[in-house]
């Protein structure tokens, strides 16, 4: 995500799904003039206020679906691994577009569609010893809600194909400058061999 960001000096930034505010503080330390971080979790924002407090950061308890409540404009809207939890992606993208200053940027990361697509059957194909060989893909071409486990069972996230994502952005008025797919480092593969 950070490799896609412009020079932050003097920028106003909105962080969607800011969590505990770590990125917000990094943005300020990188020269941002003002950062607004929004998150649906009051508990995460309480941690953000304690651990990542700064006079240039404002934290708001607001779901991404309610961006139209924000009246100011930003140079940059950022979201790290949160957009796949929003049901109405089209509305979100239009709201973000409307919150940007002229020549503003929207930089986001989300769970890869090959991960979000899975909805039935066995997630992994394993060898006779139970070792994971590869992830199974199912229902990639069908956008919609999926349930997963992320600390708890039944977490809802929304799968979208690459074409759905790209076309939604273009229809809202965005020009796509760059797309990067994540590739795990050797260190990450050793640390998390089951993923």
Language-model-detected regions and their locations in the chain:
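A short glycine-rich, Lys/Arg-flanked "PGG" loop and its adjoining helix->strand segment in the class I
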Residues: 90-105
């Amino acid at each position: 995500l950070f490799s896609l960001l412009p020079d932050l000096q003097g920028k106003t930034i909105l962080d969607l799904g800011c969590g505990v505010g770590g990125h917000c503080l990094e943005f300020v330390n990188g020269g941002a003039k003002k950062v607004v971080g929004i998150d649906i979790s009051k508990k995460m924002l309480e941690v953000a206020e304690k651990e990542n407090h700064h006079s240039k950061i404002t934290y708001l308890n607001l779901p991404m679906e309610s961006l139209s409540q924000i009246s100011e404009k930003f140079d940059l809207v950022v979201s790290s691994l949160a957009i796949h939890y929003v049901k109405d992606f089209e509305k979100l993208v239009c709201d973000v577009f409307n919150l940007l200053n002229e020549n503003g940027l929207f930089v986001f990361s989300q769970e890869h569609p090959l991960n979000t697509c899975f909805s039935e059957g066995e997630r992994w194909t394993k060898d006779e010893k139970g070792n994971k060989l590869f992830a199974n893909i199912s229902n990639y071409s069908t956008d919609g809600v999926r349930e997963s486990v992320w600390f708890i069972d039944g977490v809802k996230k929304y799968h979208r194909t690459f074409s759905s994502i790209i076309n939604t952005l273009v229809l809202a008025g965005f020009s796509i400058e760059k797309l990067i797919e994540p590739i795990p480092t050797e260190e990450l593969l050793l640390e998390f061999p089951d993923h």
